[in-house]
């Protein structure tokens, strides 16, 4: 992610961003740099929601992951695009 796109993600947290969300061992969700952007966009608070969806090759599905600093997050889904919302 370039600095410009990172700044854009931070300043416009509810806009869809094209970053890959990948599962890690089927139990831990790795949201990469976009997770950091979402966290920063929400002021570094304790929680935020991260909604993702993917459409392609005849497959349409959506997924929503909630992150909490105390509980962490988990998932086993790989998704291609996402939107974060401060809570």
From Swiss-Prot:
Region described as Disordered: spans on this chain: 1-31
Bias (Low complexity) ranges: 14-31
GO biological process terms on file: sorocarp development
Disulfide bonds listed in the record: none
Biased composition (Polar residues): 1-13
PANTHER family: HSSA/B-LIKE PROTEIN 1-RELATED-RELATED (PTHR31059), HSSA_B-LIKE PROTEIN 1-RELATED (PTHR31059:SF5)
Recorded family membership: Belongs to the hssA/B family.
Listed name of the protein: HssA/B-like protein 55
Gene source species: Dictyostelium discoideum (Social amoeba)
């Amino acid at each position: 992610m370039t600095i410009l796109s990172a700044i854009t993600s931070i300043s416009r947290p509810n806009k869809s961003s094209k970053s890959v969300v990948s599962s890690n061992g089927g139990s831990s969700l790795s949201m990469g740099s976009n997770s950091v952007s979402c966290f920063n966009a929400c002021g570094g608070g304790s929680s935020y929601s991260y909604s993702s969806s993917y459409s392609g090759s005849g497959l349409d599905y959506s997924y929503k992951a909630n992150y909490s600093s105390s509980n962490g997050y988990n998932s086993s889904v790989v998704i291609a695009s996402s939107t974060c919302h401060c809570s």
